[in-house]
């Protein structure tokens, strides 16, 4: 390897008489987390070389040499042959070193003209995030599909619906499962909306003030798959709201999975007995032979805190930074890289867990009326007979009190007991005191009636497919 400057492995050094101290370098180095940007450095460098050529700052022959060298460097990065050295300060310095080793300092040293690490890293980070969020979006659709699959497998299964963790009203299991799919689809919609702001290129902004070399930021933006170049070079190099927004969306995905995980943890307990976990997606105990632990769900719940922490930490880093670029912004990448890494572990595991759950429909049905979940149906039956809801609510509550004192269900009250509460409670009220009737009666849009849940499932599946197609569409041609 040749030596090419005062501070080898970095992009600065001429005004310094020596390199940084060991402790200073240890603090400054970032290749252990920014190396994910290396493939994007190659793509952006090719685009930059072309605009240098267009501006007559790079000859045709030098352009050809440089593009060939960048091709070789890109392949070496992809294969793992080229890696950062301990002396490389960051991905940018390492990649310049690699290019110069291939094409020599005369040609390789020209690439830096008109660009700064400030606009470079802001652009590469956006490029990496745009690809990474599409990968996450695709995996989220697979979890949504697993929920829809289970809904299809159990179209008529009835379970207890809860509010405040207390028995509320009977609902279809499919309705409950699809209720977990909906926020995940909104998460993908947030990703798509976020992508509009990610699709603005800071390249050409220089350190902060733009470039005097008559380069073409729009040409670079177009080649790299962006919608446009940024409108303000100071903002382009120093803003990381896109990173904070990314951290939020990733944390929200984890939160939505954590809510599902929490339910699965309870559902598989003997006390609930709703589901049995697949052996492939559970673990045992080192001392208790009978245990079958919901580790996937618990790790999802635990790692969600980690993603929330990444968001909180990034927001704290970004606050109160003056314009323009500050070195604090080096801290923007680690939490984002980590959040993506955690979701890449969690999403396939949760998808596997959900798709292999065995639901016990008889158990769900037996618990559906427990806790007097048909009380609302009784009250609404009275409303349909012309009774004001306030009176109907009181009467239904009185029926619950009698049934509770006897240890029976509402459907087991005698005709005399019903009439003693309100003479308008005739024997016909028994037609609504079944969980099947209660579920079927809730046929408004979004309700738990089978016909409505089937509509929901169809929309979930079509939306998931649409989002899948978006996620699979390459950012760059």
Curated annotation (Swiss-Prot):
EC number: 4.3.2.1
Predominant location: cytoplasm
Keywords: Amino-acid biosynthesis, Arginine biosynthesis, Cytoplasm, Lyase
Compartment(s) where it occurs, according to its Swiss-Prot or TrEMBL record: Cytoplasm
Source species: Corynebacterium diphtheriae (strain ATCC 700971 / NCTC 13129 / Biotype gravis)
Pfam name, any one: Lyase_1
Recorded superkingdom: Bacteria
This protein's encoding gene: argH
Metabolic or biological pathway: Amino-acid biosynthesis; L-arginine biosynthesis; L-arginine from L-ornithine and carbamoyl phosphate: step 3/3
Catalytic activity: 2-(N(omega)-L-arginino)succinate = fumarate + L-arginine
Gene Ontology MF annotations: argininosuccinate lyase activity
Gene Ontology BP annotations: arginine biosynthetic process via ornithine; L-arginine biosynthetic process
InterPro entries: Arg_succ_lyase_C, Argininosuccinate_lyase, Fumarase/histidase_N, Fumarate_lyase_CS, Fumarate_lyase_fam, Fumarate_lyase_N, L-Aspartase-like
Family of the protein in this entry: Belongs to the lyase 1 family. Argininosuccinate lyase subfamily.
Full protein name: Argininosuccinate lyase
Enzyme class per UniProt: lyase
Residues spanning the membrane: none
GO cellular component, one term: cytosol
């Amino acid at each position: 390897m040749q030596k090419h400057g005062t501070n080898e492995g970095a992009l600065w050094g001429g005004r310094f008489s020596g390199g940084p101290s060991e402790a200073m370098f240890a603090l400054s180095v970032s290749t252990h987390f920014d190396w994910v940007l290396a493939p994007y450095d190659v793509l952006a460098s090719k685009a930059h070389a072309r605009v240098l050529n267009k501006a007559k700052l790079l000859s045709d022959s030098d352009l050809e040499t440089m593009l060939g060298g960048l091709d070789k460097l890109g392949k070496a990065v992809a294969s793992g042959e080229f890696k950062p050295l301990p002396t490389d300060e960051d991905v940018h310095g390492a990649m310049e070193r690699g290019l110069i080793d291939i094409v020599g300092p005369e040609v390789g040293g020209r690439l830096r003209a008109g660009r700064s690490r400030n606009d470079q890293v802001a652009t590469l980070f956006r490029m990496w995030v745009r690809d990474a969020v599409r990968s996450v979006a695709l995996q989220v659709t697979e979890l949504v599909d697993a929920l829809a699959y289970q809904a299809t497998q159990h179209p008529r299964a009835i379970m207890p619906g809860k509010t405040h963790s207390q028995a509320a009203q009977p609902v279809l299991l499919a309705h409950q499962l699809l209720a977990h799919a909906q926020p995940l689809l909104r998460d993908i919609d947030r990703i798509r909306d976020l992508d509009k702001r990610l699709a603005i290129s800071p390249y050409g902004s220089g350190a902060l003030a733009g470039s005097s070399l008559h380069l073409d930021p729009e040409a670079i933006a177009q080649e790299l798959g962006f919608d446009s170049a940024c409108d303000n070079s100071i903002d382009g190099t120093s803003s990381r709201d896109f990173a904070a927004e990314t951290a939020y969306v990733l944390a929200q995905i984890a939160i939505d999975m954590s809510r599902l995980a929490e339910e699965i943890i309870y559902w598989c307990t003997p006390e609930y007995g709703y589901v049995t976990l697949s052996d492939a997606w559970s673990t045992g105990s080192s001392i208790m032979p009978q245990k079958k632990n919901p580790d996937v769900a618990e790790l999802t719940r635990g790692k969600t805190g980690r993603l929330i922490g990444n968001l909180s930490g990034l927001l704290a880093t970004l606050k109160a930074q003056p314009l323009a670029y500050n070195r604090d912004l080096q801290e923007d990448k680690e939490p984002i890289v980590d959040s993506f890494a955690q979701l890449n572990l969690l999403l396939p595991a949760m998808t596997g867990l959900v798709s292999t759950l065995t639901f016990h429909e008889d158990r769900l049905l037996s618990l559906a009326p427990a806790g007097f979940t048909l009380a609302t149906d009784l009250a609404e039956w009275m409303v349909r007979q012309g009774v004001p809801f306030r009176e109907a609510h009181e009467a239904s509550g009185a029926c619950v009190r009698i049934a509770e004192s006897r240890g029976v269900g509402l459907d087991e009250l005698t005709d005399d007991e019903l009439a003693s509460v309100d003479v308008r409670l005739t024997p016909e009220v028994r037609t609504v005191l079944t969980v099947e009737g209660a579920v079927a009666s809730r046929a408004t849009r979004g309700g738990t009636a089978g016909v409505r849940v089937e509509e929901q499932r169809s929309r979930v599946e079509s939306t998931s497919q649409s989002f899948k197609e978006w996620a699979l569409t390459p950012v760059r041609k």
